[in-house]
């Protein structure tokens, strides 16, 4: 059963997701800041598949770890849940009868509308609440065994990141985990240039043109603010996480798991 808050603003017009990403195919006279509205939402799944290296494998790994840490009577939070791909994947891996509920939070009503549709089509029967919310504001996290930040924290203004991690830590039950997947900077400028070049080569292999790559890069310039790997690790440790490890790394992408001791 999918449960929605009355104020979650998911009453947008019906949307069909799964379209091919062509947001930046045409030359634009002016490239506006990237956003997660309707035009992005309907192509978002394809965008991730073609823009994030080994995306399906990352999703599988995130789901496996979430299942490892999920506990009866607790809540699994997905912060920046977008179209709920991760929640659906986790639900398939949980043992039958495990009593957990999901909370998905996203700032885009259109993403939440597609999330509700995907969860219904995936046959998710555990309780799931989809909330319209901005991570730049205060979070409400409690009784959590798992909290996910999958390619989300990089879009949060840096001045709010410590607070978010602290609120996650405080809302986790003992032995609960935070799973963090981020685009990251190289530890020095030479490595960073190499990693970015190879990333763009990957996008070309996946069908993006140089124009699309350039225009999306410009759109993201003031929106996506990545940290270095060590900065993210220090951020987690600084807010209380003592056990932090890396489970995926590809050039300028990294995935980490942190456990509350």
Spell out what each predicted region is:
Residues 177-205:
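Conserved class I S-adenosyl-L-methionine
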Residues 222-239:
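Short alpha-helix
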Residues 77-78, 84-137:
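Class I SAM-dependent methyltransferase SAM/SAH-binding core
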Residues 29-33, 38-58:
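Class I SAM-dependent methyltransferase Rossmann-like catalytic core
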Residues 54-72:
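Conserved alpha-helix/loop element of class I SAM-dependent methyltransferases that forms part
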Residues 139-147:
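A short acidic, Gly/Pro-enriched loop at the edge of an enzyme's catalytic core
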Residues 162-174:
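A short glycine-rich, Lys/Arg-flanked "PGG" loop and its adjoining helix->strand segment in the class I
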Residues 242-261:
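Core SAM-dependent methyltransferase catalytic element
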């Amino acid at each position: 059963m999918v449960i929605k808050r009355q104020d979650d603003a998911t009453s947008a017009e019906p949307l069909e997701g799964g379209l091919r990403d062509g947001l930046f195919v045409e030359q634009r006279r002016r490239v506006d800041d990237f956003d997660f509205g309707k035009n992005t939402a309907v192509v978002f799944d394809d965008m991730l598949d073609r823009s994030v290296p080994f995306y399906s494998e990352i999703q599988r790994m995130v789901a496996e770890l979430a299942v490892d840490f999920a506990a009866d009577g607790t809540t699994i939070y997905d912060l920046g849940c977008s179209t709920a791909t991760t929640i659906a994947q986790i639900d398939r891996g949980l043992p039958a009868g495990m009593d957990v509920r999901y909370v998905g939070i996203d700032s885009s009503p259109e993403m939440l509308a597609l999330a509700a549709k995907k969860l219904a089509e995936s046959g998710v029967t555990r309780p799931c609440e989809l909330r319209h919310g901005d991570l730049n504001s205060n979070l409400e996290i409690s009784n959590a065994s798992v909290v996910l930040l999958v390619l989300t924290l990089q879009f949060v203004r840096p001045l709010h990141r410590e607070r978010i991690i602290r609120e996650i830590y405080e809302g986790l039950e003992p032995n609960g985990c935070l799973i963090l997947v981020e685009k990251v900077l190289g530890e020095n400028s030479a490595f960073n240039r190499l990693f970015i070049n190879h990333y763009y080569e990957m996008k070309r292999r996946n069908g993006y043109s140089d124009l699309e790559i350039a225009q999306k890069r410009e759109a993201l310039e003031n929106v996506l603010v990545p940290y270095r790997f060590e900065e993210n690790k220090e951020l987690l440790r600084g807010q209380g996480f003592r056990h932090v490890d890396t489970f995926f790394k590809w050039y300028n992408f990294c995935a980490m798991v942190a456990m509350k001791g």
